[in-house]
Amino acid sequence: SDIFARYAADHLFDEVHEVGVRDGSNLSIDGYDFAPTFSIWTTIEECLNPPIVWEKDRGLYTTDCFSEPEVFHFPAGIGPVECVNVEHEEVLLIPREVDCSRVTFKYGLGAEFIDWLKTFAYLGLDSKEKIQVGNASVSPRDVLAAVLPNPAKLGHLMHGKTCAGTWVRGIYDGAPREVYLYHVADNETTMREWGSQAVLWQTAVCPVVALELLAKGDWKATGVHGPEHFDAVPFLNLLGDYSTHHGILEMGPGMWPSP
C-alpha cells in the first residue's frame, strides 16, 4: 500500500489530495463460523485499538473502532465490501513521504466478523493480562489463540481472493483524478504455486521483494525508512517477477466518500 502511494505521487498525479488504503476480500472457509485468516493477536491489536486518521491541518487523531463505514467495490471479481476504519501503520508512514491532505486505512471486515470481535472484547477475551485459572496463570488472548484454528493451516479450506490497494485522489494535468492501485492474491493460485494461503502469502511476499532490492543495492538509504521512501518502480517490476502483478483502476469522479 505504501509503495502504491509512492508510485501514484511520482507517476500518476501532479497533486495528491487524499490517500486511502482499502483492503478487502471475498474469502470463505469451509467448516468454520469464525476462523481468522491472520493471527488473532494481530487481528485484535489492529481492530480493537482506536483507528488513526491523519490530516494535514490536524495531524494524527483517533476515531472509534469500526467507524466511517463505506462500501468499496473491489476489482478481480471480489465486488462490493463494507470497509471500516482500522488501526494500521500506513496512516503514520505515508504522510512522512507523500505530500497530501488526508490518509486513512479501512478494511473490509464484515458485520459478522465485527460482532465476534466486539463479543471477545465484551467478555475480556482480548486481554493480554494474565489471570489465575486454578493453578495456572493464563492470558485470555492466549486462550483464544489456542482454541481458534491456525491460520497457516486453513489454506486447503479457503476459497476466494484477497485484495490490498491504495485509493488516491488528486489532480493530474489540471483535472481531478482518482485511481485505485491494487494487488490481488487468489487462494487457489497461492496454494497451488506456493503452498500458502492467500492472506499470509500476500503479507509475506512484499517484505521478500523489499529485502531483495536492499540486498542487491537497488534500494539504498541510511536510517529507518518505510517503503514509501523508496522508488516504487523496481519494487513493482520485481513483484511481477514473482508471478504476481499489480493493477491500476481509474475511478469515476465523485466516488470518494466524504469524511
Predicted segments, located by residue:
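C-terminal catalytic/substrate-binding lobe primarily of soluble NAD(P)-dependent oxidoreductases
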Residues: 11-259
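Active-site-proximal alpha-helical scaffold in enzymes
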Residues: 1-12
